[in-house]
Amino acid sequence: MLISTPSRNLRPGRLQPPALDALGQRSLNRRSLFKAAGAVGAAALIPLTACSSPASATGVTTIRFMQNKPEVIGYFNQVIKDFEALNPDIHVVQDSNEGNFVPSLVRNDPPDVMTRGYAQATADFTRKGIFADLSGLPAASTIDPKVQGLVNSWGQYNGNETSALPFSLAAAGVIYNRDLFAAHGVQVPTTWNEFVAACNTFKAAGIAPIYGTYKDHWTIQQGAFDYVAGGTLDVQGFFTAINAKGADISSASRESFTSNFGAVLPKILEVAGFAQPGAASKNYADGNAAFGKGQAAMYLQGPWALSELVKANKDIRLGMFPLPVSNNPEDAKVRVNVDMALLIARNTPRMEAAQRFVSYLLQPAVVNAFNEKNAAFSTLKDAAVTSNPQITGLAPFVKEGRYYQGAGTYFPPAVPVGNYLQAFVYGKDGNKFLADLDAEWRRVAERTAI
């Protein structure tokens, strides 16, 4: 299996956009990852050293909580304050520097409780046995099984452990300007033909149908690439198969990109072609400013962009819908990722305190308030439908489990899919694009084969 590096995933609300490597995923080099994985593999069954005693002389147990979003430090400070008031025998120290995670593994001193974006990177650590099995916590039974399935789809330690409990689910789609749609009599499209017709209506009116920011290649990757691929293919099934093929992959293989992604490419180009002139010279910041000012009808971005658009125009009325890529409305699906998952270090000597804190974080009042505030979706079974009008268009799809995890999240950073996508959108050579992906995948598989 290809091994990717630790990362940030899509971020909701006022959070920052993905960075340039693998959709904003904060990465470490392969040497650091393998060193950490090796250290954990050797130390997984060794108790943590006595330098971290379970409780102080006062009877108060201090636990370290590393969460993956510096932008929500204030929220968690209040949550911790409330928790400590109810649990005076536990003190929680918040750490928002996720870059300390791998060094802490090498030192055999990981944080007691963590939140991490959950995809290939975190799953690599799960498979090494770093995280405790949380299936026995009563709170585990409150998680929506469909959302828990997203976590489990990346693999489980010992094949059956529940190493992470989802806390926040982010959904991305097509952001649209409600006022422009209303002014031109355009309804939210539910089929591919309706989407193309909407684009042509705006184009005829002199309005850019889509604001493209192709100078930042990650915006092509998480946008047109992920949306079209996710709505067309069984993304998870494809990457399971190509991982199993390993270094034996070639363009002629049944499991290859060439054999599977050919049908996706024409629609990626068609979507890209509806962008404004000069999209190749515009970046994400340009797009936020321009779309906020009403210079386009649609924007292929995720929830992290919403607050930036409102910042550019406080009166803008926004909505979101999944990009339809077939002419059957029932085929429509939305791109999601587990933006925050809760984990406990397997060898923490403060397990009871850590479990109490995780159980508190998964109370509906905590989970639901966080997600409502940050334009994300609750991971709980019985959560109320979001009241945020910016994302209500995605809510039915999330509720029904009509979603996929983006194809871009399955690539290790060693495969520069964003660069190849950018070259494809500019040069329109689909055969070369797919052959390049097959060759890159094979090279990385050869280097990481163990």
Question: Whereabouts are the PLM-identified features?
Answer:
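Short, well-ordered beta-strand elements
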Residues: 59-70, 90-95, 113, 163, ...
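Extracytoplasmic/periplasmic solute-binding protein
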Residues: 161-167, 196-250
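N-terminal secretory signal peptides and thylakoid transit peptides that target proteins
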Residues: 18-40
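Conserved C-terminal helix/tail region of periplasmic/extracytoplasmic solute-binding proteins
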Residues: 2-3, 7, 13-24, 182, ...
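Glycine-centered hinge/linker elements that transmit conformational signals in sensory
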Residues: 201, 242-279
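C-terminal lobe and pocket-closing loops
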Residues: 124, 130, 302-315, 326-419, ...
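Extracytoplasmic/periplasmic substrate-binding proteins
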Residues: 80, 121-123, 262-350
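Hinge/lid segment of periplasmic solute-binding proteins
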Residues: 119-172, 196
